[in-house]
Amino acid sequence: IWKGLVGSEMCIRDRTYMLPSLHHGGFVTCEPCDVPVNKRHLDMLLAHMTLSDKPHLGAITEMSRAQDSVDMAEIVFGKEVMDANCVIMGNVNTNSPLLVDKVVTEAARAYSSRGQGMVVVPFILSGAMGPVSTAASVAQAMAEAMMVCAYIQLLRPGAPFVLGNFLSSMSLKSGAPTFGMPELSLIHI
């Protein structure tokens, strides 16, 4: 049926498609390391677009890949539908503390300028890339996400924006990430 999707990739994508509790296909289900990097995103997008009816994300790792994702979505949905609806989104992380890099700004430009959505998820380990206190880490995450939101709205007012966060802490003794600590339940409320 399609040369680029075989073996475990096909199996994983089939499982994602068949589970009714999974409402989204994501983007990188399984990294196809046997495909050249400059073409990998095209194969993954084609698989999502032809083998599943679930929404999915697009590529963000380079401006051309983000643009390819938006262009492929336009081929599938048409310009009129795409102008009126968000049909694909990109998911980016800020580089804490308080840095929005080239990858984020270029992906935001590719998606938002065409009215497509961006999911922005600051990744902060309290005590390493952010303040030790829970409240200060949340404030930093909000500031980082709002920087990207403001940029997106400058590019195209009203462009869709989803704010997420990935906040955790680290042991100040060992430096190891400490997932599952009680502070995190307060952060994700």
Task: Describe the role of every protein-language-model region.
Residues N91-I187:
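Glycine-rich anion/phosphate-binding loop at the beta-strand->alpha-helix junction
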Residues I1, L5, H48, E144, ...:
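Residue-level signal for functionally critical sites in structured catalytic/ligand-binding pockets
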Residues I1-G7, I12, I187-H188:
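Single conserved hydrophobic/aromatic residue that forms the stacking wall/gate
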Residues S8-E9, R13-P131, A135:
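Catalytic alpha/beta active-site cores
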